Amino acid sequence: MNHFELFGLPPQFSLDGSLLSSQFRELQKRFHPDNFATASERDRLLAVQKAAQINDAYQVLKNPISRAEYLLSQNGLEIRGEQQTMQDPMFLMEQMELREELEEIPHGSDAESALAAFDARVSKMYKQHLASIEQELNDAQWPQAADRVRKLKFIAKLKNEIELVEEKLFG
């Protein structure tokens, strides 16, 4: 049973987050190991395994990057944990320039506004890539979707770096 089947969801990138959460809570309740306290040792072990499977599946499906990676793996393209280098020099150059720009923001005269504008740009880029991934997955364009996921990972890392700069600037 795959993660989508476990939650009773269609195997697609776009999903209803609130439905996923409610299904997760329902499955958690149903298979919570405490419910099997008086059951046989075998049934208790199965309940623990099922609870772990439910938790793992939820973690994968709730995150758009891991959800896309999972969909790709379900279609024969395993990119989770891969060490393949990015083959798009223009994208890599853009990422380097964005990181350099982020490094300069704290030293500028209006760091707060500059960081907010920078964050908005990167968030827009992130959303555009998510939309492209959804389309590529819907169209079964697996290699293109895989490349887009690799790029989205770079952008997600940049978003995390923005948060770190924000914490340093504003505590």
UniProtKB/Swiss-Prot annotation:
Keyword Chaperone found: yes
InterPro entries: DnaJ_domain, HscB, HscB_C_sf, HscB_oligo_C, J_dom_sf
UniProt-listed GO biological process terms: [2Fe-2S] cluster assembly; protein complex oligomerization; protein folding
PROSITE patterns listed in its UniProt record: DNAJ_2 (PS50076)
Disulfide links within the chain: none
Superkingdom of source: Bacteria
Residue ranges of every copy of the J domain listed in the record: 2-74
GO cellular component, one term: iron-sulfur cluster transfer complex
SMART domains in the cross-refs: DnaJ
UniProt cross-references to SUPFAM superfamilies, sorted A to Z: Chaperone J-domain (SSF46565), HSC20 (HSCB), C-terminal oligomerisation domain (SSF47144)
HAMAP family in UniProt: HscB
NCBIfam families the record matches: hscB (TIGR00714), PRK05014.1 (NF003449)
Function: Co-chaperone involved in the maturation of iron-sulfur cluster-containing proteins. Seems to help targeting proteins to be folded toward HscA.
Protein name: Co-chaperone protein HscB homolog
Species, as recorded: Vibrio vulnificus (strain YJ016)
